[in-house]
């Protein structure tokens, strides 16, 4: 056996054996080799499958993560996506091969360890299953699939092959979200009993995405890969059969957070949808959708309201948890997590204590006085029930960097900053698991539960009926 081939097998067997136990076991520093200097054998060779807008976002983030080497790029838009991604990688000294056919890539690239999949939703199951069966670990963007059957096949393939599958619900690796879940909800239960949740993704949708006419994909290739036209290829999210609709495409992240924070899956859903803004000729999915979920939890029943607008961006994106003692609002887009104490139902000295110990932080005036005030004084000064309007979001210059503060002196924030691109911690988690240093934060079974939760909204909207979930439906 030649030296080069032996080194390749040793490196790959090391990474794959580490990942095999990494999903359920975290290596000690000695076992994972962290006490010795990093070697080439620690590098992870990656292929990018889908080099469009989202694929390039993930690619650019991976370029910032040590030990990640791109070896291949695959995309059917050769004159645009493929060339741009491949050239950029070479500029960063990632020598790579470019492919149109993913099967050819998986067959020829024998030195890969993992594949990052950022193709349209209807390709996710096929690309994921093929990559797993080729012996590779997979990071797959959300939505997991445009069908429940496709998501189920992905779970089964991961189990059958023993390879890792991380679904791209990146809030599960976000330090702010983790702090809120672990510390605020599980440890201290600062909100008390949660009775309701609301979330939204409001935006102004782009007009149909165009393309350079000189860079069109030929009709034969489009048809081979499931598209009727370049317009459909460029705007696939709005076509039935190509995506799971707006709640699946965009709501997967937020409904996943709600499932995670409430510790269970929904028991029922009602939904409505309509096309009020976008051109119906080029859009098959609704541009406006609203869903009402019911959850049965240990705390009691919880009502969840979720909306998507495509013509108005007021309020942006957020998840809000309403408890008897307070409200928690998180927003990945605004990079914030704030708590609004409900003083009628809670002890103001408890909230003052949270601030005094640094468990939560207040606005500048409060924090400047913290050292010289007792808990009782903080409570009387800053946590007195008043008839105040709901908080309005503003920027205050003397606040800790990276935190957006409401213009209400009772509103608190978590003492955790998130200074990385939003996808980076989730990708880092995936690569750490391959090296045997962590557990997946969104394994396929969790992604499947989210897929079931969001895809059923479409049926509810189309039929106008309240649909019940059975616990067995969330098991693949």
Q: Language-model features: where?
A:
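Active-site beta-strand termini and strand-to-loop segments that position acidic
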Residues: 293-298, 323
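Phosphate/diphosphate-binding loops
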Residues: 306, 310
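C-terminal helical cap and adjacent loop that interface with cofactors, partners, or active-site loops
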Residues: 8, 17-22, 57, 249-266, ...
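Predominantly a Rossmann-like dinucleotide-binding segment in NAD(P)-dependent oxidoreductases
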Residues: 50, 54, 160-166, 171-283, ...
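Short, solvent-exposed turn/loop segments enriched in Gly/Ser/Thr/Pro and often Arg
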Residues: 77, 99, 118-123, 145-146, ...
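Non-transmembrane alpha-helical segments in soluble domains
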Residues: 15, 59, 74, 86, ...
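Short, solvent-exposed loop/turn segments that connect beta-strands within catalytic domains
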Residues: 92-94, 296-302
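N-terminal glycine-/serine-/threonine-rich beta1-alpha1-beta2 phosphate-ribose binding loop
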Residues: 2-140, 152-164
């Amino acid at each position: 056996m030649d030296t080069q081939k032996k080194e390749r097998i040793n490196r790959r067997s090391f990474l794959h054996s580490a990942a095999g136990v990494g999903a359920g076991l975290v290596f000690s520093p000695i076992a994972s080799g962290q006490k010795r200097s990093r070697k080439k054998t620690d590098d992870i060779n990656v292929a990018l499958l889908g080099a469009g807008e989202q694929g390039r976002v993930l690619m650019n983030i991976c370029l910032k993560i040590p030990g990640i080497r791109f070896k291949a790029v695959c995309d059917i838009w050769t004159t645009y996506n493929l060339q741009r991604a491949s050239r950029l990688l070479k500029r960063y000294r990632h020598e790579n091969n470019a492919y149109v056919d993913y099967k050819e890539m998986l067959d020829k690239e024998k030195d890969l360890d993992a594949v990052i999949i950022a193709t349209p939703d209807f390709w996710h199951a096929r690309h994921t299953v093929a990559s797993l069966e080729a012996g590779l670990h997979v990071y797959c963007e959300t939505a997991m699939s445009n069908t429940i059957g496709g998501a189920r096949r992905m779970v089964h393939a991961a189990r059958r092959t023993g390879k890792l599958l991380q679904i791209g619900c990146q809030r599960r690796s976000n330090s702010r979200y983790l702090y809120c879940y672990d510390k605020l909800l599980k440890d201290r239960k600062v909100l008390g009993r949660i009775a309701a949740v609301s979330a939204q993704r409001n935006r102004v949708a782009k007009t149909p995405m165009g393309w350079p006419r000189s860079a069109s994909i030929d009709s034969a290739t489009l048809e081979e890969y499931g598209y009727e036209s370049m317009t459909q290829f460029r705007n696939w999210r709005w076509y039935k059969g190509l995506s799971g609709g707006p709640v699946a495409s965009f709501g997967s992240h937020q409904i996943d957070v709600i499932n995670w924070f409430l510790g269970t899956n929904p028991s029922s859903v009602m939904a409505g949808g309509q096309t009020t803004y976008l051109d119906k000729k080029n859009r098959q999915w609704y541009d406006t959708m609203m869903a009402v979920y019911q959850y049965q939890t240990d705390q009691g029943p919880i009502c969840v309201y979720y909306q998507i607008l495509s013509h108005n961006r007021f309020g942006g994106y957020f998840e809000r948890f309403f408890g008897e003692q307070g409200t928690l609002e998180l927003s990945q887009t605004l990079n914030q997590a704030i708590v609004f104490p409900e003083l009628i139902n809670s002890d103001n000295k408890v909230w003052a204590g949270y601030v005094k110990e640094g468990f939560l932080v207040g606005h500048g005036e409060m924090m400047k006085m913290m050292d010289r005030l007792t808990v009782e004084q903080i409570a009387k000064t800053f946590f007195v029930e008043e008839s105040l309007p709901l908080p309005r979001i503003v920027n205050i210059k003397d606040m800790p960097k990276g935190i957006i503060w409401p213009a209400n002196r009772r509103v608190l924030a978590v003492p955790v900053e998130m200074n990385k691109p939003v996808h980076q911690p989730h990708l880092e988690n995936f690569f750490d698991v391959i090296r045997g240093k962590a557990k997946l934060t969104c394994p396929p079974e969790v992604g499947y539960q989210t897929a079931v939760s969001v895809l059923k909204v479409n049926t509810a909207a189309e039929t106008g009926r309240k649909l019940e979930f059975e616990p067995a439906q969330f098991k693949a």
